[in-house]
């Protein structure tokens, strides 16, 4: 398993962070908090229902910064962004909680989820079952498992922990080898294909298109990274990919939800979903 240098650095720091968190709050207490958290909102179902209707199932990301691009959004109010995304038609939210490399925070996830009715994925680097229980405790409805960061045994353990606390799993792959491992190890219906090469940081939508034929029809493909314009969306929809994770394009816009609506709904003349949240 070849782990990119940047990812190695993140994972090394993440191991330290998990140890620090565990020292502050023990697992038993986190489990208690998880049991008392609001019920999961059904992340996978929210995407699957849209995709069945061949409508855009957008996971809209709330991300202040990234290691490669620096700060993406100076005016960063998670609750405000969440409401904007919901009005714009997002199916789900993704909230970065990694502190050191993405300037994220657990509080951002809590604030975003409290401001809307959408399911939320905790976007972080999961390497320990403690983090999975913690995700449920802070209100997450889904977690991300990055195949390039995990061996098969740990990946299966983390997925089992997620299932035990009622969390959905989005598994992320970058190439055919990772895809094969993911399909063999996990039964989650959500398979994310990251179009960004973690070694070079180059983005190519061909990554999704190349891997599509290898994915069983009972799995939902989520294309991640590189969706910047209407042509990108249409390229995916022609190939029957209806689930998208988009962050940077929205974070750089004055009104993230309006940009979501424009990119995925306005130019197709579709009725905007979620414009009247409960």
From Swiss-Prot:
Record pathway: Amino-acid biosynthesis; L-tryptophan biosynthesis; L-tryptophan from chorismate: step 4/5
Catalyzed reactions per annotation: 1-(2-carboxyphenylamino)-1-deoxy-D-ribulose 5-phosphate + H(+) = (1S,2R)-1-C-(indol-3-yl)glycerol 3-phosphate + CO2 + H2O
Keywords in alphabetical order: Amino-acid biosynthesis, Aromatic amino acid biosynthesis, Decarboxylase, Lyase, Tryptophan biosynthesis
Top-rank taxon: Bacteria
Pfam families assigned: IGPS
Biological process according to GO: L-tryptophan biosynthetic process
GO terms of molecular function: indole-3-glycerol-phosphate synthase activity; phosphoribosylanthranilate isomerase activity
Statement: the UniProt record of this protein carries the keyword Lyase: yes
The protein's Enzyme Commission number: 4.1.1.48
Similarity remark: Belongs to the TrpC family.
Record-given protein name: Indole-3-glycerol phosphate synthase
Organism listed in the record: Pseudomonas aeruginosa (strain ATCC 15692 / DSM 22644 / CIP 104116 / JCM 14847 / LMG 12228 / 1C / PRS 101 / PAO1)
Record gene name: trpC
């Amino acid at each position: 398993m070849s782990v990119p240098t940047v990812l190695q650095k993140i994972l090394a720091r993440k191991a330290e962070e998990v140890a620090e968190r565990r020292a502050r709050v023990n697992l038993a207490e986190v489990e208690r908090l998880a049991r008392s958290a609001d019920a999961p909102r059904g992340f996978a179902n929210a995407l699957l229902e849209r995709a069945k209707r061949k409508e855009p199932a957008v996971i809209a990301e709330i991300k202040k910064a990234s290691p490669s691009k620096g700060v993406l959004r100076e005016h960063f109010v998670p609750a405000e962004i969440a409401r904007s995304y919901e009005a714009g038609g997002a199916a789900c939210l993704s909230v970065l909680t990694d502190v050191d490399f993405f300037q994220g925070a657990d509080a951002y996830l809590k604030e975003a989820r409290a401001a809307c009715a959408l399911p939320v994925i905790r976007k972080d680097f999961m390497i320990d079952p403690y983090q999975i229980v913690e995700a449920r405790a802070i209100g997450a409805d889904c977690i991300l498992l990055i195949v390039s960061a995990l061996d098969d045994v740990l990946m299966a353990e983390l997925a089992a922990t997620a299932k035990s606390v009622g969390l959905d799993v989005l598994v992320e792959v970058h190439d055919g080898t990772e895809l094969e491992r993911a399909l063999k190890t996990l039964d989650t219906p959500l398979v994310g294909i990251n179009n960004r090469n973690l070694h070079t940081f180059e983005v190519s939508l061909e990554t999704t298109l190349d891997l599509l034929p290898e994915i069983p029809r009972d799995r939902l493909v989520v294309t991640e990274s590189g969706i910047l314009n209407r042509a990108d969306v249409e390229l995916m929809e022609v190939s029957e990919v209806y689930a998208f994770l988009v962050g940077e394009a929205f974070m750089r816009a004055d009104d993230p939800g309006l940009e979501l609506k424009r990119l995925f709904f306005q130019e197709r003349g579709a009725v905007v979903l979620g414009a009247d949240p409960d």
